[in-house]
Amino acid sequence: MKMINLDSKKLASFYVACELFKQIQQYPHTKLGLATGGTMTDVYHYLVNLLTKNKADVSQVETFNLDEYVGLKASHQQSYHTYMNKVLFEQYPHFAKNHIHIPDGYSENLEAEAERYNKLLDERGPIDIQILGIGENGHIGFNEPGTDFNSETHVVNLTESTIKANSRYFDNEADVPRQAVSMGLASILKAKRIILLAFGPKKKEAISKLLNEQVTEDVPATILHTHPNVEVYVDDDAAPDCL
């Protein structure tokens, strides 16, 4: 696992955007695993700028999102479908729609949807670069503490800490969905390369645990120690004291 400590969130985000852009330029059929949330917004901003400036061909690029809330239509303002459209797919509208994959959290049969997405990942993968955030409790994707390391795409119950952390995106905490469809930990580890980002003082403890804990289901992110190609980008506020 390689740690990269940069001065600011913007600088780290730019570096990661450059890595994604280089991958797209070198491998036109690349497969990207995408994440959402405040951590990722600047990454997509810089990636859109790079793609636009270079008039990049993304027609063969395929994207796979980590997760989606249960109970929200794709058109809902707080769905991850809407987020991805706002920050990337509408900003650079040259991705083929049939190459954009996001779980359907509004499916009538969530278990079947998880199975469908899992099959899609197996058939179209492996993902070349998977980007990840990390929760304050050490979750990646929506894989909360205690998640089986062998888990594949599944329906998860969100912890109270995750619900509280995500409530800032909703009118009130009661509106935050209590479940999500998420790639499992085993699914994430199938990616050829993983880039995790963490910014701000609230992520400092999670990064410290990632670095110092043994591999344990109590801190899902520690499973990344078993992967041969992981980079962790942090800003000064999230960097543990040992860095």
Curated annotation (Swiss-Prot):
One of its GO terms (molecular function) is identical protein binding. Pathway: Amino-sugar metabolism; N-acetylneuraminate degradation; D-fructose 6-phosphate from N-acetylneuraminate: step 5/5. It catalyses: alpha-D-glucosamine 6-phosphate + H2O = beta-D-fructose 6-phosphate + NH4(+). It holds the Pfam family Glucosamine_iso. SUPFAM superfamilies: NagB/RpiA/CoA transferase-like (SSF100950). One of its GO terms (biological process) is N-acetylglucosamine catabolic process. One of its GO terms (cellular component) is cytoplasm. The active site is at D67, N137, H139, E144. Keywords: Carbohydrate metabolism, Hydrolase. Its EC number is 3.5.99.6. HAMAP family: GlcN6P_deamin. Belongs to the glucosamine/galactosamine-6-phosphate isomerase family. NagB subfamily. Catalyzes the reversible isomerization-deamination of glucosamine 6-phosphate (GlcN6P) to form fructose 6-phosphate (Fru6P) and ammonium ion. PANTHER family: GLUCOSAMINE-6-PHOSPHATE ISOMERASE (PTHR11280:SF5). This is Glucosamine-6-phosphate deaminase. The lineage of its organism: Bacteria, Bacillati, Bacillota, Bacilli, Bacillales.
